A protein has these predicted regions:
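A residue-level marker of the well-folded mature domains of exported/periplasmic proteins
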Residues: 2-6, 12, 24-407
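Hydrophobic helical h-region of N-terminal Sec-dependent signal peptides
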Residues: 14-18
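C-terminal motif of bacterial Sec signal peptides marking the signal peptidase cleavage site
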Residues: 19-23
Length: 407
């Protein structure tokens, strides 16, 4: 986004004698619920913190300093790449570092690696963390097959596992999932499309629904959300669903798919795009065809610079903002409890997510996303410092920024 959690699919691999569980091709929809999960602390009274405690100043993390002093072992963080989203190095790494340090961990107590898009590199990084005495691994896997293999090897060594940002289908028993409510992300995209069609006065909407990569569990949840919101409009004939081709997180592939669909169905006049990068690729195609602003809705997520600028330009209806500082703190807090041998409280682990491959309900820390338009851009992403005004408000967008009260 993503994605807000969006990446190129890599093949499943084996880790030692562990056979990777290729859960990527499951066609069963995955549902997220708000059922309370988690449990009471262990024999030592643990500090209590909730999924709604976190703020942009990271002050809540100081409540967990006792956990940092009680805990043992390394917390290893495995990030996926730098190509599918700028978020991992620009936001996840510094925010996770800040969260760990605010809770009292030293530089030798945690380690953050990026696999640069290579499943074999992530495997090597995981093995190194385990060898160095990791007690907890945060896994933001490139794909479910390789992620499941890493998690199986980790749990075999007694290492606790957290699925960070994306659920690993077929992952380890006993893990915790930390992410935004990804069905809600999809619902925001779907409602944003509806609102945009109305405000831009799109006549007889013929919508192309474009998904993320089907092997990414988040993409499944996003689609569950926006298709659920749009289905009544399709069912009553208000909108026409032109098609829903195979999904991708590769923008160039998304552009090609859109152009092929538009050639075959020139009546398409709106697109559901699941993230900002794919939307940007589609918008580039629209601009080549000289389609004017505020006539052809697209959607997105991740609140990327290009996405926000496309919203200001009137080519994108909005973008889902997932404040990564919330997700980083949720993951760091969960890791601190596990490292200290404590069960994270139910106020933190506030939901469950169904892993249909493992046929398991995974305790989850679910954080709340925000739909960003020109109406609230100043009070959300700009206020939080997620984007610099100097980067956002280039000369061509001076008037749009002024109208949006961004300064």
């Amino acid at each position: 986004m993503h994605v807000l959690g969006n990446r190129t699919v890599l093949g499943a691999l084996c880790l030692g004698a562990v056979v990777a569980l290729v859960g990527c091709s499951s066609s069963t929809s995955t549902k997220t619920t708000g059922t309370t999960a988690g449990g009471t602390a262990g024999s030592t009274q643990a500090p209590q913190i909730s999924a709604t405690s976190f703020t942009s100043d990271f002050s809540a993390m100081a409540q967990l300093k006792s956990l940092a002093s009680q805990g043992k072992g390394l917390i290893g963080v495995l990030l996926p790449d730098t190509t599918t989203s700028a978020r991992y190095e620009s936001f996840d790494r510094p925010y996770l570092t800040k969260a760990f340090q605010a809770a009292g961990l030293g530089a030798n107590d945690f380690k953050i690696d990026n696999a640069q898009g290579s499943a074999s590199t992530m495997q090597t990084q995981a093995e190194a963390d385990i060898t160095q005495g990791a007690s907890v691994l945060l896994v933001d896997a490139l794909d479910s097959g390789s992620g499941a293999a890493i998690e199986a090897a980790a749990t075999a060594k007694g290492v606790k596992v957290i699925d960070y940002d994306r659920l690993v289908k077929g992952g380890a028993a006993g893990r915790t999932y930390v992410s935004f409510d990804n069905v809600k992300v999809g619902q925001l995209i779907g409602q944003g499309e509806i609102d945009c069609i109305s405000s831009w006065k799109v006549n007889k909407p013929n919508i192309l629904v474009m998904d993320g990569d089907p092997t990414d569990n988040n993409a499944t949840l996003f689609a569950q959300g926006y298709n659920g919101v749009l289905k009544p409009k399709f069912d009553d004939g208000s909108y026409v669903k032109v098609g829903e081709p195979a999904g991708t997180w590769t923008p160039s592939v998304a552009a090609t798919t859109f152009e092929q669909q538009y050639t075959a169905h020139p009546n398409i006049n709106a697109v559901v795009t699941p993230n900002d990068d794919n939307a940007n690729a589609v918008i580039a195609s629209l601009q080549k065809m000289n389609i004017p602003a505020k006539t052809f809705p697209t959607t997105g997520q991740d609140a990327s610079l290009s996405g926000l600028q496309n919203v200001l330009k009137g080519y994108q209806c909005g973008t889902v903002y997932k404040p990564i500082y919330l997700e980083a703190q949720g993951a760091a807090a969960t890791a601190l409890y596990l490292r200290a041998g404590q069960t994270p409280p139910a106020s933190l682990v506030n939901g469950t997510t169904q892993d249909t491959t493992a046929n398991a309900s995974v305790p989850s820390v679910l954080l709340t996303p925000v739909w960003v338009t020109t109406d609230n851009m100043a009070s959300t992403v700009v206020k939080d410092g997620a984007v610099k005004v100097s980067d956002l408000c280039i000369s061509a967008l001076t008037s749009a920024c002024s109208a949006a009260k961004i300064s």
